[in-house]
Amino acid sequence: MPLLLLGETEPLKLERDCRSPVDPWAAASPDLALACLCHCQDLSSGAFPDRGVLGGVLFPTVEMVIKVFVATSSGSIAIRKKQQEVVGFLEANKIDFKELDIAGDEDNRRWMRENVPGEKKPQNGIPLPPQIFNEEQYCGDFDSFFSAKEENIIYSFLGLAPPPDSKGSEKAEEGGETEAQKEGSEDVGNLPEAQEKNEEEGETATEETEEIAMEGAEGEAEEEEETAEGEEPGEDEDS
């Protein structure tokens, strides 16, 4: 009888708690009853906006976004050309970026002007687009971008880690190999120079030796002539 009463009253209690009713035979086993109740719990992200599917805390993924401030309606051909070059380069290299127009959005214009460092602003204090940021970190203007691109340090300029197969890493490796080859070539090139120098020094020493020998021979000849001249008067006196 107690089992029957439990079976009759348990469905009512479960319905009141917004849980599915269980069979009378399952109510006798607490493990089965709990197993039947668990499937009604809503574990979706909507029910737990700050938690994961299993109720764990969600940690936001930090993703750096490159911001390029442009003026789409600029009347300057030079500015439009610079903007197109920056945007085209980022697209060609599959670098994610966000294009922000300052011509039609006062907030974008104000934010750009306030976040460009003072030493990077022109004399009138109004920086011209394109201006490049990594989130809130200032990267530079077009001139800085162009220099970084020419030196192949664009990822460092943007504050991004270069991909493994990027041209920057390849250029660094090639640069190291080129420097090593250049040093080796310089060492090899120095050998003939050293040999030539030694040969020149040897020739110079030989010439000096020959000159000294010639001078010595001339000196001896002069002494012999003087001796001969000194002997001739004596012979005349004897005769």
From Swiss-Prot:
Family: Belongs to the SH3BGR family.
Keyword Cytoplasm included in the entry's annotation: no
Keyword Amino-acid biosynthesis: no
Protein name, per record: SH3 domain-binding glutamic acid-rich protein
Residue spans of biased composition, Acidic residues class: 198-239
InterPro entries: Glut_rich_SH3-bd, SH3BGR, Thioredoxin-like_sf
Residues covered by region (Disordered): 159-239
Molecular function as annotated in GO: SH3 domain binding
Record key words, sorted: SH3-binding
Chain span(s) of sequence motif SH3-binding: 124-130
Gene Ontology CC entries for this record: cytoplasm
Gene designation: SH3BGR
